[in-house]
Amino acid sequence: MNQSLLRRGYWFWFKYEPNLFWYYSIPTKHANIILVYLLIEMFSRVPAKSIARFRCVSESIHRRPDVTEQSLTKSMSRPRLLFALEVNKDLLFFSSPQPQNPYDNSSLVATPYKRFPKYLPTRICTTLGGLVFLQKWLRKKTRVICNPVSGDYITLPKVKATGVGESYFGFDPITKQFKVLCMTWSRYGTPNTHQVLTLETGKRLWRTIQDPILPHYRSFDRICINGVLYYGADFEESQSSKIVCFDFRFEKFSFINIADEGMFRGSYKWTLFNYKGKLGAHQYSRNGELVLWVLEDAENHKWSKSICILPPIVHNSRIVGVTGTGEIVFSPYACYMPSPFYIFFYNIQTKTCTRVHVKGFEEFKHNFTLLHTFLDFVEDTKFM
């Protein structure tokens, strides 16, 4: 047996595979190729959290595109629920499998991810793929992107502008690039000039985009679907509300008209969601009536409308998204940990509601905890 190979760690990987002992007798130049292949095969069979822990063994393997793509493809086929808890100024992440066909009174177990430093922002703006976009307001606007699985995080550079407003996180599935759009403004009455940062570039710099739009204020939610950012906005000049669209690939703005004048009345109550790849918007009233709008034709600004009467069990919860099968998911705003924590799946077609118990938060006894629930989280082990 070749002692040099043993010193390089090959025996560490394969001592439990007797049928692979022949490997040690082949030339080193071929051995390296086989080692990479076997490691890729091994990574494809273990959870993403375990892959993240393996980085101390072989960082170069983790950075290979075929390894990260294989892990991401596997994770996308099995989306997860992500839970973010604010406990004593700490932001903690947990995750569980996302049930495809939940049944009433079933249960899930949420397991923790890595902890992040206390000084990171705790305001969650967006989760996209396997990354989470955090933002801190007050005087110093700090923007951080973190990976709950690997524990990596980066702080984005400061934006240089007269005025700095909201920032939005997006992903272009064609170029496979993550980008951040920062809304900045100049003096009143002049078109806004906004800035974009591309996450994948080696030197992260903000650059001004060449598609200014008139001053407006974001009036409610935001979401990124298939590389396009959507958010509701009020325009002072025209005294109207519209859906603002930003294509992250071409870095261009466009607009979608609302369905009727009353659609976004009381717009602070509206939330946007992904409905089977289409833009959806909903308004939830206290009497249990849920109004759903779905953008059927973006080019012609055509919306469909439906109304649901929800059961009382979800009246104190908020909508956190819609599953790929069309079920609306509700989650409480917060929880007091001695009490059980439930999420609810409402089937629009059958008008049935399924309650699922989420376990795993028992360590936070006697804590009143703000809790955010996100659907379709993808475990991504890629380095940032």
Curated annotation (Swiss-Prot):
Domain F-box: 28-74
InterPro entries: F-box-assoc_dom_typ3, F-box-assoc_interact_dom
Coiled coil: none
The protein, known as: Putative F-box protein At1g53360
